[in-house]
């Protein structure tokens, strides 16, 4: 099975690196905990879960620097095209394949706008790079996470735990029980005061149902 390296850049931004480099939710320029600059990242494909600036602030810039297309909801894709960004549009339930990477969009319970403009449905992604990674995007817990677990069978789940705008630790624990991943990695917490959360508590809860939680450190690679 292909080796996978996961690098957390803070907030909900991850590099998933196998034979190709997939970058999810690039938010670096105004991210107070980020340690890399947009121009330092060289992805082959960029995924954006929704239009809020703390998830796609640097998508166009990185795309133009690297020629990596941005996968986004149809409405957000059309807006990014106006900026001269190469995009691949998708909507929940849809699947795209790009250079051996398979990406399926899932629903997410959130909102989406881009500079005040409606930006389509918020989404999560199941990314198949030999192993399946579910990036939930910004979302609360929803019952259909059981279907994601049953149908898509992700090996790894990247789940928000910060509360306020997304599910909190308890909601993420419900997500773990629904999805049943072997590994879970918390995200979208401790970037700002409003989303303070304790990842150790999440780790303890998830361990009671057999999911191993890896608490990420910014820019420290996780080898799986």
Curated annotation (Swiss-Prot):
NCBIfam families to which the protein is assigned, alphabetical: PRK00685.1
The name this protein goes by in its record: UPF0173 metal-dependent hydrolase Ta0764
Species lineage: Archaea, Methanobacteriati, Thermoplasmatota, Thermoplasmata, Thermoplasmatales
Statement: the UniProt record of this protein carries the keyword Ribonucleoprotein: no
Listed Gene3D superfamilies: Ribonuclease Z/Hydroxyacylglutathione hydrolase-like (3.60.15.10)
Keyword Hydrolase appears in the UniProt entry: yes
Pfam families the UniProt entry points to: Lactamase_B_3
UniProt-recorded Gene Ontology molecular function terms: hydrolase activity
Domain of life: Archaea
InterPro entries attached to this UniProt entry: Metallo-B-lactamas, RibonucZ/Hydroxyglut_hydro, UPF0173, UPF0173_UPF0282_UlaG_hydrolase
Family classification: Belongs to the UPF0173 family.
SUPFAM superfamilies: Metallo-hydrolase/oxidoreductase (SSF56281)
Keywords in alphabetical order: Hydrolase
